Amino acid sequence: MEEKITYKNAGVDTEKGREFIQKIKRNVESTHGPRVIGGLGGFAGAYDVSVLKKYKHPILLSGTDGVGTKIELARLLKIYNTIGIDLVAMCVNDILVCGGEPFFFLDYIACGKLDPEKMDQIVSGIVQGCKMSNASLLGGETAEHPGTMKEDEFDLAGFVVGAVEKDSMIDGSTIRSGDKILGLESSGPHSNGFSLIRKLLLKEGKYLPTDPQQVKFLKDYALKPTRIYVSSILKLLQQVSVKGMVHITGGGYQENIPRILPQGTQSKFFKEKIPSGYFFEKIKKDHKIEELELFATFNMGIGYMVIVSEENAELAKKIMESSGEVVHEIGEIVSGNKEEVQFV
């Protein structure tokens, strides 16, 4: 008997997709507050923006990002419950740079074949990240791509929307020579530099090492989720005038810091004040990579930076430390070419 031609035979199991939605529904809806209208599964996510009435002149902020090739490391290690946190962190930390409070988050997951257990773990991480950011997981899409992705392959993208008061929006325009740079410690490489990490630490750049200690190092240090700085920074902004902020992501110091500096200013860092931590010290020790290349690739132990006037530096540091952050005064602003970064 001739086999029936169906969508399922072509590689897309819509019934399994519906079951997956039911499986994650309660978890996703645990991020919903009174602003979310309706539940999961509709054509659109609905969010009550009457909250904007508390703003004199609200500015909406949006951001989108992924987790890069850190996903490949998670796939090899079969650990899926942390990269969802990474996904949220990469987005919310970006709009936070402008002083933005996240409102809601959306996710997109593409996979070769839907594995409900694996996807449930990924979504659980996204839910955890949303709770840490006080953002609602308003909706998402999980798409099977049979024939174009291998069955165990997947990729993630995240999208966040938030708001900031226009007069409170932080754009770096008031930064001046003499201002201090405070660095908030990272948890490790966060979600950047993983193409280099895989080249250095995986066999042929794509297989797990055979040494169990090296595998443990990858699990314990490389795969640690990206820190979410939302609550600490929003608390700081209520009490201290902040001139500029930087989320250290792809391109490290050299690519990210110039993005918020006015012309005629330059960042100067004191290397001995930057707590690179075990992961980066091991990379530096075990592999012949120039230090400047490391700073141009990784966060080197500092995931987020806050620029304040000299007189506000100590107070800002204390406030962030009271929120549980580990903070270091790692540099200052000097006169010079904003595109160049000094390390002394």
From Swiss-Prot:
EC category name: ligase
Source species: Leptospira interrogans serogroup Icterohaemorrhagiae serovar copenhageni (strain Fiocruz L1-130)
Keywords for this protein: ATP-binding, Cytoplasm, Ligase, Nucleotide-binding, Purine biosynthesis
Entries under Pfam families matching the protein: AIRS, AIRS_C
Family: Belongs to the AIR synthase family.
The keyword Ion transport appears for this protein: no
A Gene Ontology biological process term: 'de novo' IMP biosynthetic process
Reactions catalysed, as given in the entry: 2-formamido-N(1)-(5-O-phospho-beta-D-ribosyl)acetamidine + ATP = 5-amino-1-(5-phospho-beta-D-ribosyl)imidazole + ADP + phosphate + H(+)
Family matches, as HAMAP family: AIRS
Pathway noted in the entry: Purine metabolism; IMP biosynthesis via de novo pathway; 5-amino-1-(5-phospho-D-ribosyl)imidazole from N(2)-formyl-N(1)-(5-phospho-D-ribosyl)glycinamide: step 2/2
Compartments where found: Cytoplasm
Entry superkingdom: Bacteria
Chief place where the protein resides: cytoplasm
One cellular component term from this protein's GO annotations in UniProt: cytosol
InterPro entries named in the record: PurM-like_C_dom, PurM-like_C_sf, PurM-like_N, PurM-like_N_sf, PurM_cligase
Record GO terms (molecular function): ATP binding; phosphoribosylamine-glycine ligase activity; phosphoribosylformylglycinamidine cyclo-ligase activity
Gene3D superfamilies named among the record's database cross-references: PurM-like C-terminal domain, PurM-like, N-terminal domain
Enzyme nomenclature, EC number: 6.3.3.1
Name of this chain's protein: Phosphoribosylformylglycinamidine cyclo-ligase
SUPFAM superfamilies: PurM C-terminal domain-like, PurM N-terminal domain-like
